[in-house]
Regions:
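Short, small-residue-biased leader/transition segments that mark boundaries at the very start
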Residues: 1-8
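A conserved regulatory-domain signal marking ACT and ACT-like small-molecule sensing domains
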Residues: 9-173
Length: 173
């Protein structure tokens, strides 16, 4: 990769430190695409078929969202690095006969914004504070992922800087 692209990646993954709080920082990542496979058969093994296919292509998957099954079908959305989006779509389209499913959509105008800290799942109100900060800026959340050390949301890339500032302010004040 070029020096310019390395600088770019450092910039988009910059972190804002939040001192003296449970939250250690706010991170932004714009190297994200959201893929959705519509109307996947709601039967055992479909997640394995989809994600093993991507693993064979060395495509890293981060956040996964699966809708509740209806009429024997469900939608599966997940994030991949922007540079892998097209090869992921191609791999999935080539395997439609194996995985079933309908249309495959890709959204390349997303960003992942995360708050990072320790023991977040055992402290009530952390996610709520983050979501309120986004709501107050009229920022729509497309996907959410939580763990013990991180809460991440997928939002429109155009809102990423505003989101980082709003979340930072919510936890500082």
């Amino acid at each position: 990769s070029s020096a310019a692209s390395d600088v770019y990646k450092r910039q988009v993954k910059e972190e804002t430190k939040v001192e003296g709080m449970l939250i250690k920082g706010v991170a932004k990542d714009t190297d994200v695409a959201v893929l959705t496979v519509k109307d996947v058969p709601d039967v055992p093994g479909m997640s394995f078929k989809i994600f093993s296919l991507l693993a064979q292509k060395n495509i890293n998957v981060d956040i996964i969202l699966q809708t509740t099954g209806r009429d024997g079908k469900k939608d599966m959305s997940f994030t991949v690095p922007l540079g892998d989006a097209e090869s992921a779509v191609a791999a999935l389209k080539n395997a439609t006969h194996r995985i079933g499913g309908g249309d495959i959509t890709v959204d390349k105008t997303c960003a992942k914004v995360s708050i990072v800290g320790a023991g977040m799942q055992s402290h009530s109100g952390v996610a709520s504070t983050m979501f309120e900060a986004l709501f107050n800026q009229n920022i729509n959340i497309k996907m959410i992922s939580t763990s013990e050390i991180k809460i991440s949301v997928i939002i429109d890339e155009a809102d990423a800087d505003k989101a980082v500032a709003a979340i930072h302010d919510a936890f500082i004040n």
